[in-house]
Each structure stands twice: as C-alpha cells, then as structure tokens.
C-alpha cells in the first residue's frame, strides 16, 4: 500500500533548507531506496516516492515558510540535475500505475505553478548538469531555468526517439504554451535524443540563460538575491493582480508572516476503509463502490473569526484539516483501490456552520494563511475533478452541502437529493466563495461550467437568499434527481448498480470529456490531451509490446515498430 503522507525528517531523496526568504530544494536521490524492487534510481531518476516528497515539500513551503520568496530547485549530484522518471520502473509497472504516476507528477508541477501565480513565490531551476525527460519537465514548471555550461550538460525530452512514448509530465505542452517555443523548433527538440546545450537552448527559449561552471553558483546566487530584494514576486501576474497582491500583503504587520506546522493526519487504516477525524471512507469492494463522508465543522459559536484565531488553531482549523484528509483519501483511492469505480459523496453537519466558515474565509481572503487555505481547497477539488472515478453526491437529511462543501456536489457527475419534507428537510446553499474561489482546471467555476447555456441562471443562483430545498434546487438546475421517500432507496441502489456495471475505460473517457466544458487552458491541455495520448501510447505495441521501445530500452535488443500510423 502506498502512503502519500511524509515530512522533511522522513525525506530520503530531497534536502529542504530555508535561509530567510530563500528556500533550496536539492535533489539527492538515494538509488537503493525505491518504492518497489528490481531497479535502482541512478542519475537522480525518480519514482513515485521521490515525487511524494517533492509534493510534500512544496506544500510545506506554502504553509510552514510563508516568508519565502524564492525557491531554488537544484541537485546535489555532480554533473547531473535529473534523469527523469526511472525507465525500468515505468516499463515494468501496470498501465494503471503508469497513469496514476504521471497524473500525480503533473499535479505536483501544477502546484508549483499555482504557487508562483497566486502566492508570488518565484521558482528557479538551477541545472548544474543534464536535465533529461522528467528532469527538464520539472525545470520547465519553474519560472526561470539556468543551465551550467560545462561542455557536456544539456536539456532534452528524449521520450519519443528513445522510448516510443511522450514526455508525460507536461513537457510538450509547456514548451509551446509556457515557454512559447516555435512549433518547428519544438518538433526538433522533442525528437533530438541528445537534446540541446546552453547556447542553442537559450536561443530557442528553452532556458533563460547559461553560465560557465566557474561562475554557475555565483550567478544563481546573484539572481536569487535580485528576486529576494523585490518587495514581492509578481511572477505570472498582471499589473493589476500584482498591485492588489502587494496591497493586501502590506496590511499585515510589517509584512512578517509566521507559518503553521502541518502535523501528521489522524488516520486509521481499516480492512474496509480509512477513518480520519473529519472524513470517512468506506470501501464496498465486492460492489466496486465507496462511501465518502465529510463532516462539517463544529458549532459556529466555537469557530474562529479572525486571522489571529485561525493561525492559533493552525492545521487543526476545520477547512484546512478536512481538505487535507479529503486529499489523502482521493490519492489513496486512486492508487490503492483501482477497482473502486464509483464514489458516493455525502456530508453531515449544519449548513449554517459551513457558511459561517466561508464567511470568515471570504472576509479574510487577503491574509496569507486564509489565502493559502482557499488555494489548497481549490487544488483538492481539482484533484477530485481529475480522479478517474465516478462521483455521485447523495443529499439526505443532515447533509451540509453548502459553500465550499457544495463544490463536492458540483464536482460530482450526478447528484441525488431526497425530496421528503416529512422525513426532514434537505437543503443546499451557495456562499460567496462559490463565485470564484475554487476554479477548475479550465479557469471556470463549477457553477459557471454548469450554467454555460444560461449565465442569467448562474446570477440568480448566486443571488439566492437562504438555502435551496429539494424542489427549489431542482428548479434552479443544481440537482440531477430529486426522488421522494418511496423511490429513494431503490433509485440510489439502481444508480449504483448501473454505474458499476459499465466499462471503466469508457466511463473514464466519458467523464473526462464531460467534466471540463468551456475554454481550454494549459492545464486542461496537459490533462486532457497530453495525458490522454500518453495513456493510449502506454498500451500500444510500439511502446510496451515485446518489440516495443519502452520494453527494449537498455537491452541489447532493438525496438521494431509497426509503421502504420493510427
């Protein structure tokens, strides 16, 4: 069983150090410390365990070290930055594991960009040696890339010419969409196994600069000092966003921000599921579905209303703790429970308590900690969007689908709401946070995506005073079905049985197509185009067949392709 929880004192492959407002994440992969047997992580290659540590470090920088302005990602190995994902590990892994591995690494790199865009940190990739494949994909997720000019070091995306697959962690998309490299040059770069060295890499826009070995560290340090001296990083921001960001930060005492500690989750693994403090996951393995229940906050009389009170609670503050638990539950299901095809999402609690939390978050959204909590909630909800499981929201008496928890319902593929006033009223409610605090990968809110055909209905929903009962929610277009008490149990049972009887492959593709209506962004191109093509290629004989390139990499045998284009 793979565990996604870790902490700096447990890291095997990364060294995280912080000096004032500068953090350094140095990659030093221990080749014998692997997630599975049968391979060694040479040349700073990585497996899922390496990336779990990276994801944890980035998360901790945001919450535990908010004063950090610059993050330098480097390597402690001489003449090598990172050789990317370990090829033998990929070649011998199941298709499902390959898919989830690439999805998680993509989410980690998107989290780096989210930090740059919304929290103002600038990430610098200091390539002290060759960065190939996933190594360059990690670098290109950063804001700036600097390569050592030692006559040997290069950057490359060699997956197509060497392995017969794609750079699966966003490389192709970021080359043309983020670095804005010309298409013809990107084509050459992506089929050139040996890659490009400093001068041409800079000329083509694949790196920002290159420095000789004797001046490399000095030059990196100078650039770091230059960025750290600026009042606040404005990477990837418009002028208006930058001004608003700086103004909000200046409202805090002398600009000083003290972080909070992210403690280990209270988590119990049981034969039939996982129990957290606020989240419960029950696995019905024979029926191939899970019940995911999220508890609302404690009574509003005890809820904090000021940033100081929130910071005092630290990671035990309900919206942060519950979303950390939800995040872990989603990852656990993805990797450890592949045959669970459907997740029934429920909530329990008082709608007014959830709305009280949202009111506090909205009122203090410019405070660094509240901002990070909101951004984290948005990332977890996007992880739910990108999870290859069906989600049905079940709204019963005692549910609290409101505000930030309403997003769980909106992220679900269907919703069922009991319409039986005699048994106890069911209701759902929006808050101001539903209007823009939790964007999807396509940049839209889930309500915007829901009402693409009728924006005026969206305005009416957001302007609605009070909660929606079942009939009102149905009329407003918020709910899929509103069965009465006579049909409730049968309708839920039949819906579960029907969904779990369908092809999981077809459902994954169908859901990915239906969940992201509206515009396309770099993120949706990565997840919906690059990832989809990579997943297809991962099953093709030219990659993984007996004579495929991935299968034969590193062997004395040569790949033989079926040259029919498909």
What is the role of each PLM region?
Residues 1-52, 57-69, 76-83, 96-99, ...:
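C-terminal alpha-helix plus adjacent terminal tail
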Residues 84-96, 100, 104-115, 128-144, ...:
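Hydrophobic, small-residue-rich alpha-helical packing segments that form membrane-like cores
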Residues 107, 111-118, 376-384:
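Catalytic-core regions built around general acid/base machinery
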Residues 119-131, 388-398:
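A short, small-residue-rich loop immediately preceding and capping a beta-strand
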Residues 123, 145-146, 210, 391, ...:
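Short, well-ordered beta-strand core segments
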Residues 132-189, 402-460:
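CoA-thioester-processing core
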């Amino acid at each position: 069983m793979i565990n996604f929880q870790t902490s700096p004192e447990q890291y095997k492959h990364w060294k995280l150090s912080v000096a004032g407002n500068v953090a350094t994440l140095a990659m030093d992969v221990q080749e014998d410390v692997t997630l599975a047997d049968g391979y060694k992580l040479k040349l700073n290659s990585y497996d899922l365990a390496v990336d779990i540590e990276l994801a944890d470090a980035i998360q901790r920088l945001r919450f535990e070290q908010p004063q950090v302005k610059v993050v330098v990602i480097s390597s402690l190995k001489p003449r090598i930055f990172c050789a990317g994902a370990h090829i033998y590990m990929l070649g011998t892994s199941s298709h499902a594991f390959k898919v989830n591995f690439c999805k998680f690494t993509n989410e980690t790199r998107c989290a780096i960009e989210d930090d740059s865009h919304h929290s103002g940190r600038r990430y610098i990739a200091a390539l002290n040696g060759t960065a190939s494949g996933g190594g360059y994909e990690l670098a290109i997720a950063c804001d700036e890339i600097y390569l050592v000019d030692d006559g040997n070091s290069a950057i490359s995306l060699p997956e197509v010419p060497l392995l017969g697959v794609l750079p699966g962690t966003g490389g192709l998309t970021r080359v043309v969409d983020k670095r804005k490299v010309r298409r013809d040059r990107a084509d050459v770069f992506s089929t050139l196994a040996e890659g490009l060295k400093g001068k041409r890499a800079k000329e083509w826009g694949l790196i920002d600069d290159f420095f000789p070995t004797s001046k490399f560290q000095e030059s990196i340090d100078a650039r770091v000092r230059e960025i750290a001296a600026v009042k606040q990083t404005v990477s990837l921001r418009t002028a208006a966003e930058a001004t608003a960001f700086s103004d909000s930060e200046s409202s805090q005492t002398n600009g000083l921000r003290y972080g909070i500690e992210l403690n280990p989750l209270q988590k119990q693994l049981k034969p039939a599921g996982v129990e957290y403090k606020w989240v419960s996951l029950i696995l019905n393995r024979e029926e191939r579905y899970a019940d995911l229940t999220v508890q609302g906050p404690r009574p509003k009389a005890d809820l904090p209303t000021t940033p100081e009170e929130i910071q005092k609670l630290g990671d035990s503050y309900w919206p942060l703790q519950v979303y950390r638990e939800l995040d872990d539950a989603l990852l656990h299901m993805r990797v450890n429970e592949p045959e669970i095809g459907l997740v029934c999402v429920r909530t329990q609690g008082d709608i007014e308590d959830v709305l009280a939390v949202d009111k506090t978050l909205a009122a203090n959204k410019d405070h660094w900690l509240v901002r990070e909590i909101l951004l984290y909630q948005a990332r977890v909800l996007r992880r739910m969007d990108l999870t290859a499981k069906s989600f049905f929201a079940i709204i019963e008496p005692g549910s609290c689908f409101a505000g930030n928890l309403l997003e769980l319902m909106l992220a679900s593929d269907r919703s069922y709401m009991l319409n039986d006033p005699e048994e106890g009223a069911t209701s759902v409610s929006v808050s101001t946070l539903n209007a823009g605090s939790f964007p999807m990968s396509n940049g839209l809110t889930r309500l915007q995506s829901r009402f693409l055909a009728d924006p005026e209905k969206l305005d009416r929903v957001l302007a609605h005073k009070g909660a929606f009962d079942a009939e009102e929610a149905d009329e407003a277009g918020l709910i899929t079905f509103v069965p009465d008490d006579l049909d409730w149990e049968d309708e839920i049972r039949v819906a579960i049985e029907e969904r779990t009887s369908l092809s999981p492959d077809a459902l994954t593709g169908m859901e990915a197509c239906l969940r992201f209506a509206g515009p396309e962004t770099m993120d949706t191109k990565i997840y919906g185009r690059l990832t989809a093509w990579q997943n297809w290629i991962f099953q093709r004989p030219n990659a993984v067949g007996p004579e495929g390139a991935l299968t034969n990499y590193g062997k004395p045998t040569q790949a033989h392709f079926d040259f029919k284009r498909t």
